[in-house]
Regions:
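Acidic/His- and Gly-rich active-site-bordering loop/insert found
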Residues: 3-106, 110-137
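Generic structural signal for well-ordered, non-membrane alpha-helical segments
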Residues: 6, 10-13, 17-24, 41-45, ...
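Metal-dependent amide/peptide-bond hydrolase catalytic core
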Residues: 231-351
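A structural signal for isolated positions on well-ordered beta-strands in alpha/beta enzyme cores
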Residues: 81, 137-139, 256, 310
């Protein structure tokens, strides 16, 4: 049951959402059924642009390749940007995964996009706009999930500098006119309530692409004349595993490796291996410290086998500082009678 505290404009917004409920849900289900990987969300972007145009927003497309921005200036005032993320995450075994790309909306971006569209529907109403001042932007951003280094190399030829869409949009000035950015996401910490208000602390990360150089030799006739790049890689990853006992729980360290290449043919000693390594932690100092440990593992293993390594630094993310829920969020949740809790000390998102 709604509280009497919601004003007439708020009541109208709620009615608009209810009236368009089926449209909003259908949009989410359509996006979920057609997942697309980062920087390739052409179908999702097209559907988003069409909805925003039909609502009367001034729409700009192809921002950072697939991004879409719908804008409406009402009166002089601050500029609010509501963000939705276009891409799906790699998850080949998901029942709704795209059979070609292997991505699925397992991270809930289809729900986030629907929330953005619901807000756009409400803000497009003339009676609602009469009560507002400023500019509202609806920004559908590409590539929130980290894209692999091979795709990054291809996109760099098209002028895309960053693996992640919001970073690329910051670089190209898309956020320059934004005073307030607002978004939502499915829960990333264990929460029983339906709504979780505020921002918990979150890991940042550093990423590298490591090329391991060995020496080819016949795997049966003279393997002793080779330097096995796969063995160097395996040894380095084993060292990282043995380091894990030094990681403190309060630093929230997470360490990931994906071997992209480990030789070409089975009867030759692999002379090249390619690994992508990611270090997550709660502070920049700890990210740098663990990254140095990882790099020593690669260097030490290469030295032991007589190989070489080449390292390419990839884009990372800074750790997120926790932010308490704004009073406006709490008051709105109370007025709507929602089942919620706010960010608490100790809440942490390891992603």
């Amino acid at each position: 049951e709604m509280s009497f505290m919601i004003d007439e404009t708020g009541q109208r917004i709620l009615r608009l959402i209810d009236v368009h409920k089926d449209q909003i849900i259908a949009f989410a289900e359509d996006i979920a059924a057609h997942p697309e990987p980062g920087y390739e969300e052409f179908c999702t972007a097209g559907k988003t642009a069409e909805v925003l145009k039909n609502l009367g927003y001034k729409v700009t497309e192809h921002l950072a390749r697939t991004g879409v921005k719908g804008t409406k200036s009402i009166k002089e005032g601050p500029s609010l940007t509501v963000i939705g993320e276009l891409d799906a995450i790699g998850y080949h075994s998901h029942p709704n995964a795209n059979p070609v790309t292997g991505v699925a909306h397992a991270c809930g971006h289809h729900a986030q996009m629907a929330a953005m569209i619901g807000c756009a529907i409400a803000m497009a109403d003339p009676d609602v706009q009469k009560c507002l001042a400023g500019t509202v932007n609806f920004l559908a951003v590409p590539a929130e999930e980290y894209i692999d280094a091979d795709k990054r190399a291809r996109l760099k030829k098209e002028g895309i500098e960053f693996c992640c869409g919001k970073s690329e949009m910051i670089r190209t000035g898309v956020f320059d006119d934004t005073d307030i950015a607002l978004t939502t996401h499915v829960h990333m910490v264990p929460v029983e309530e339906d709504f979780y208000l505020g921002n918990p602390a979150c890991n940042g990360y550093s990423a590298e692409r490591v090329t391991v150089r060995g020496k080819a030799a016949h795997g049966a006739i003279d393997p002793w004349n080779g330097v096995n790049a796969l063995s160097i890689t395996t040894s380095a990853i084993q060292m990282m595993g043995l380091m894990r006992e030094t990681f403190r729980e309060e630093d929230h360290v997470r360490l990931h490796n994906v071997i992209r290449k480990a030789g070409d043919v089975i009867n030759s000693v692999p002379d090249e291996a390619i690994v992508e390594t990611k270090v997550r932690a709660a502070s920049l100092d700890k990210i740098c410290e663990i990254t140095d440990m990882v790099n020593r593992a690669y260097a030490g293993s290469a030295y032991a086998f007589g190989g070489k390594i080449e390292m390419e630094k990839l884009q990372g993310y800074m750790p997120i500082i926790p932010r308490a829920a704004d009073n406006a969020l709490i008051e709105a949740a109370d007025d709507l009678g929602l089942n919620y809790r706010t960010v608490q000390k100790g809440d942490f998102n390891n992603a």
